[in-house]
Amino acid sequence: MAATLGRDQYVYMAKLAEQAERYEEMVQFMEQLVTGATPAEELTVEERNLLSVAYKNVIGSLRAAWRIVSSIEQKEESRKNDEHVSLVKDYRSKVESELSSVCSGILKLLDSHLIPSAGASESKVFYLKMKGDYHRYMAEFKSGDERKTAAEDTMLAYKAAQDIAAADMAPTHPIRLGLALNFSVFYYEILNSSDKACNMAKQAFEEAIAELDTLGEESYKDSTLIMQLLRDNLTLWTSDMQEQMDEA
């Protein structure tokens, strides 16, 4: 590959890598685009989405791998199979160091380039939400003080995004809805605050329903899909809470 490409060429190469399902390389092309751009230069919506898709795919397969390995580890522990437990633990550590590396990579990019150069509210919310997401992914596998720090950083980023979204974006905007979805998942899965999670998801859903007629055609599909996910989570969480109350 030529050492440096033009911006359009990086976009083209990122799309090519996406088609070939070579997501690590897609990440590299988008990183080079971001670091090569002058700091004041904001990414276009297309570039921003390519960056997000690249990282989402890389982190997605690692998170799935971590969940599978962790579940095997629990099974081996319940079987008291110490030799296997030790092997699985080492393997889990390897996956965790890869997870840490990917999260650190995007978080560094967000703090050094993307958030400082974001001018429009939509971009700010997009990147702050992304920052919250990757701190949340860290909180999923870290423990002790590291988990606590990751959770605090998640909260700060989501809160900052939420403040801007509430002031400047319609309740039906897909980025604002996506933020509410992920923020509520954070409350439920990381902080174990079922009530907070349900209230946040319910409020976002109801506010969007109330303004459904303002939805533009271009974002209709995205917004209604996220609303459906909010509703699915609400259904699942309330039934889980009901079961726990019944058991108690």
Curated annotation (Swiss-Prot):
Post-translational modification as stated in the protein's UniProt record: Transphosphorylated by SERK1.
Function: Is associated with a DNA binding complex that binds to the G box, a well-characterized cis-acting DNA regulatory element found in plant genes. Specific negative regulator of slow-vacuolar (SV) ion channel. Mediates F-actin dynamics possibly through inhibiting ADF1 phosphorylation. Negative regulator of freezing tolerance that modulates cold-responsive C-repeat-binding factors (CBF) DREB1A and DREB1B proteins stability by facilitating their ubiquitin-mediated degradation when activated by CRPK1-mediated phosphorylation in freezing conditions; this processus is counteracted by B1L.
InterPro entries, per the entry: 14-3-3 (IPR000308), 14-3-3_CS (IPR023409), 14-3-3_dom_sf (IPR036815), 14-3-3_domain (IPR023410)
Quaternary structure annotation from Swiss-Prot or TrEMBL: Interacts with SERK1 in the cell membrane. Component of the SERK1 signaling complex, composed of KAPP, CDC48A, GRF6 or GRF7, SERK1, SERK2, SERK3/BAK1 and BRI1. Interacts with TPK1. Interacts with ADF1. Binds to CRPK1 at the plasma membrane. Interacts with DREB1A and DREB1B in the nucleus when activated by CRPK1-mediated phosphorylation upon freezing. Interacts with CINV1. Binds to the N-terminal region of B1L.
Full protein name: 14-3-3-like protein G-BOX factor 14 lambda
Keywords: Cell membrane, Cytoplasm, Membrane, Nucleus, Phosphoprotein, Stress response
Gene Ontology terms: biological process: brassinosteroid mediated signaling pathway; positive regulation of protein catabolic process; response to cold; response to freezing
PROSITE patterns cross-referenced by the UniProt entry: 1433_1 (PS00796), 1433_2 (PS00797)
Entry GO terms, CC: cytoplasm; cytosol; nucleus; plant-type cell wall; plasma membrane
Localization per record: Nucleus; Cell membrane; Cytoplasm
